[in-house]
Regions:
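Structural motif corresponding to the intra-repeat A-B loop/turn of tetratricopeptide repeats
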Residues: 420-421, 453, 490, 523
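Structured catalytic cores of large enzymes
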Residues: 71-249, 254, 379-392
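C-terminal soluble interaction/assembly domains
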Residues: 300-373
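Structural register within alpha-helical repeat arrays
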Residues: 413-414, 446, 483, 520
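Generic helix N-cap/helix-start motif at coil->alpha-helix transitions
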Residues: 404-411, 437-444, 473-481, 510-515
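Caspase-like cysteine protease fold
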Residues: 362-421
Length: 539
């Protein structure tokens, strides 16, 4: 990921069983949604009809376009085969009202379509071209500067170009500042001049995965997204990159305040393959090119409805391979929603994960949350998932249905909310919940919150107490790994190494031993080999 602090200056220039696939009653958002599919691909059309039926989207809001089925296309192919028919359809169906302003420019004054679902089969990205006219919008930028480098790029994600359609700019290089960035209100409450078209893609390695994304989103809205949030930070100090960790830290703090239990790792390496990621509902992390860590293991699965994002420059260079990059693999492993980059975006122009998570928790749809968290349009970003998905919709009905007992996650959340969003003020209640429910989860979440607050010794003791009530060997192993990580963060490297030696005697499976060995090498790497002396020349 290349960092571009100057990009900021450029901005200133601007398990569960799913219900049968019955039709969901239409919502205002569904009535404002357009579904775009590849008319030459029968599977793309079938997926479009399936999604529209599940969400109650009007049948006349399905738009088939004749386009390539390749993931990467040329700029000319995009303009002729994708953008032109979409614009023509908006005009022909009266989906927008375009007027000429006093300055002679055209403006979208109103629009009945505000959300777009792009189906599998429609191209993903537009390769770079050598069009000189693309730089006209940035004629004020001095050639040869970093900003000129960004402004001169005209490769882009297809979806991000469609999202910029309300701007009516003929063609751009660089990015267009997103007017919806950092907003916090539903898109339908704003005029189209203040929002982009909110474009998400229902795409992935297979048709079955796309159907799962649709079904999981709708089912989770009814049952709730309950489980762990996993954060994988890097502890990076470079000024150009530290913002990535800051997003994750901020997202973690917000989730803890909302009663979502968080497990955070701060080692510079990605989570090791043997790290037990159970009940994964949310994952935010960085930074490797291709899927790695626990996600690369056979059998790993997210909870249905999970939201998972891995920051990398090319995390969505393809979405159709279950083992390449990150977007496709995360979806193949059960996530319902992810975001990524089809080409190099620069870090500051990727999705701001703290804003994304905040807006999701405050009831916005996936499309709304994603675009409030994305600084630019006509750029490299892609959102994969049902645009209308609200993962925390069930939070508006905290009282369980009569006769239905709240699950452990709901009980944990209610305790934290009763403590004004601070797990550290609910130690007796969380301890009692762990003992009564015979699970370590409340204490593990408490220990993580204590560690995040810098209370390392207290956190270590809490995690030891958690291990005493936990019956699962897998979870006890994770608790051991968390204690080792806290010792490392506290600067107690020798104690961390001793803890690893002790745990090697307790956790003796091949996978456990390998995981502990990798962590030991990361904490205490062997010294580099001593170079051989240069032989002296003897005359």
């Amino acid at each position: 990921m290349r960092s571009a602090l100057t990009a900021i200056a450029l901005l200133a220039l601007a398990g569960a069983a799913f219900a049968s696939p019955a039709q969901t009653p239409p919502t205002p958002e569904a009535a404002a949604t357009l579904v775009i599919y590849n008319h030459t691909d029968p599977q793309s059309q079938a997926l479009a009809k399936y999604y529209a039926g599940r969400r109650g989207i009007p049948a006349d809001h399905l738009l088939g376009i004749d386009c390539s089925s390749k993931e990467e296309i040329s700029r000319d192919e995009f303009l002729v085969d994708i953008r032109s028919p979409i614009r023509n359809a908006f005009t022909a169906h009266g989906w927008w009202r375009v007027e000429t302003g006093e300055d002679g420019q055209h403006y979208v004054r109103s629009a009945s379509i505000r959300f777009v679902a792009v189906m599998r089969g429609v191209p993903l990205k537009i390769q770079s071209s050598t069009r000189d006219t693309a730089l006209e919008a940035h004629a004020d930028i001095q050639p040869g500067t970093p900003m000129a480098l960004i402004a001169g790029q005209n490769e882009a994600c297809v979806d991000s170009e469609i999202a910029a359609m309300f701007s009516l700019i003929p063609e751009t290089a660089g990015f267009i500042p997103n007017p919806y960035f950092q907003q916090s209100v539903p898109a339908l409450t704003l005029p189209p001049a203040h929002t982009p078209l909110l474009v998400c893609r229902l795409d992935g390695p297979s048709d079955a995965i796309v159907r799962h994304m649709i079904d999981a989103a709708i089912a989770t809205e009814k049952t709730g997204l309950w489980g762990w949030a996993y954060l994988d930070e890097r502890s990076i100090l470079s000024p150009g990159y530290v913002v990535g960790d800051e997003w994750l830290t901020s997202a973690g703090s917000a989730m803890r305040r909302q009663g979502i239990p968080v497990i955070a790792d701060y080692a510079s390496e990605v989570l090791p393959p043997g790290f037990p990621m159970t009940d994964a509902a949310v994952y935010y992390g960085w930074y490797t090119q291709d899927v790695a860590g626990p996600f690369a293991l056979p059998g790993f699965k997210f909870l249905p409805g999970a939201v998972a994002v891995h920051i990398h420059s090319y995390s969505a260079r393809t979405v159709r391979d279950p083992n390449a990059a990150w977007a496709g693999p995360l979806l193949a492993r059960g996530a319902a929603a992810t975001m990524g980059n089809v080409y190099e975006p620069y870090l500051e122009l990727t999705v701001h994960l703290d804003i994304l998570q905040d807006r999701l928790m405050n009831g916005l749809t996936l499309a709304e949350a994603a675009y409030t968290a994305t600084p630019g349009l006509s750029w490299m970003n892609v959102v994969l998932g049902d645009p209308l998905y609200r993962p925390y919709q069930s939070w508006s009905a905290l009282t369980p249905t009569t006769g239905v007992h709240p699950n452990i996650w709901q009980r944990y959340r209610q305790i934290v909310l009763d403590a004004n969003g601070d797990p550290l003020q609910a130690i007796p209640e969380l301890t009692k919940l762990a003992i009564d429910a015979k699970t370590s989860m409340p204490l593990e979440a408490l220990g993580q919150a204590q560690a995040a607050a810098g209370q390392f010794d207290t956190a270590l003791q809490t995690l030891r107490d958690a291990a005493k009530v936990e019956h699962s060997r897998l979870i006890r192993f994770r608790l051991a790994l968390e204690r080792i990580e806290i010792l490392r963060r506290a600067g107690r490297k020798d104690d961390a190494v001793e803890a690893i030696k002790e745990d090697l005697g307790t956790f003796d499976s091949d996978e456990e031993q390998t995981t502990l060995g990798r962590i030991a090498l990361a904490i205490n790497p062997p010294p580099p080999p001593t170079p051989s002396p240069i032989p002296s020349h003897t005359p």
